[in-house]
Curated annotation (Swiss-Prot):
Subcellular locations according to the entry: Mitochondrion inner membrane
Lineage of origin: Eukaryota, Metazoa, Chordata, Craniata, Vertebrata
Family as reported in the entry's similarity comment: Belongs to the small Tim family.
Name of the protein in question: Mitochondrial import inner membrane translocase subunit Tim8 B
Keywords carried by this UniProt record: Acetylation, Chaperone, Disulfide bond, Membrane, Metal-binding, Mitochondrion, Mitochondrion inner membrane, Protein transport, Translocation, Transport, Zinc
GO molecular-function terms, A-Z: protein transporter activity; zinc ion binding
Gene3D superfamilies: Mitochondrial import inner membrane translocase subunit tim13 like domains
GO cellular component entries: extracellular space; mitochondrial inner membrane; mitochondrial intermembrane space; mitochondrial intermembrane space protein transporter complex; mitochondrion
Length: 83
């Protein structure tokens, strides 16, 4: 197998990082849905009633908002540390 050039290695690292981010995002979505399902769904049926749909939507929205706020705050801390 031929050795990778510097540019090829950088591209490979970028692709691996992108795939890791996708996997992390997917895992996070599944985690949110599992937590929200346990919180909101009392009796699974053929269809979700409007109360359950609203609960699931609000629950996931709260988790996303919280994650974004924490990520933003962490980025601010990192940026201040780099100055």
């Amino acid at each position: 197998m031929a050795e990778l050039g510097e540019a090829d290695e950088a591209e490979l690292q970028r692709l691996v990082a992108a795939e890791q981010q996708k996997a992390q995002f997917t895992a996070q979505v599944h985690h949110f849905m599992e937590l929200c399902w346990d919180k909101c769904v009392e009796k699974p049926g053929n269809r979700l009633d409007s109360r359950t749909e609203n609960c699931l939507s609000s629950c996931v929205d709260r988790f996303i908002d919280t994650t974004l706020a924490i990520t933003s705050r962490f980025a601010q801390i990192v940026q201040k540390g780099g100055q």
